[in-house]
Amino acid sequence: CYFTMSDLGLNYWVAIAAAAVVVAALSVICERLVFHPLRHAPPIHDKIAAIGILLFLEAVVQMYWGADFRRIASPYNQILDIGGLTLPAQRLLIIVGAFSLMGALHLYLKKTMTGATIVAMAQNREGAFLVGIDANRVAMMTFAIAGALAAVAAGLFAPINLVYPAMGHLVLLKAFVIIILGGMGSIPGAIIGGLIIGFSEALGGFYLSSTYKDVIAFVLLVVILSIKPTGLFTKGVR
């Protein structure tokens, strides 16, 4: 997104769309070259491979653009006053975009045949294959959707933060916390887990100190796992 806006001079929304296409294609390539050969390996191998890809891509980005902090100019710099609540337009765009994408993904998985095949394969890959589902095609589609959504999320998030190669580390850690809190295999749980983390960080930063804002997610993780180790909305997926 930074490259397409700063170097190519594309419009903000065009840059996000281009980033979504590129990251989706890159995700499919990673699935074919890395994760597909590991489909029968122990689950830990996938995690190690994902970390390796992350470090490799960060190194490539740093080689071309350096490790300096950069900014993406937001086309929405207005400050909105909604019922006495002051809110930057870009942050409102992030909120609306997040709920819109979550709703679209939920409808896609629940109301379309393709979405149903993705859910079926997530629950039982071998069983899905036995009933005629093309597991390879569904896997590539799943990676493409995940990559595109990640690119759109990053494009919405980048204008309110500094952009640098390792900017995703903290986001990934919080995503891990959200998945654990919500329960593996539960999309509604992931949504509610994200809201819990978001509100907790906002309230903690306001009443305590913004210095400790990023620690709150991990404190919540320890507390909730101590009470309910399977997460709040687990679907029984192991």
Feature map (PLM): residue ranges:
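Membrane-interface helix caps of multi-pass small-molecule transporters
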Residues: 3, 7, 28, 32-37, ...
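Short amphipathic alpha-helical coupling elements at transmembrane boundaries
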Residues: 35-40, 77-81, 117-130
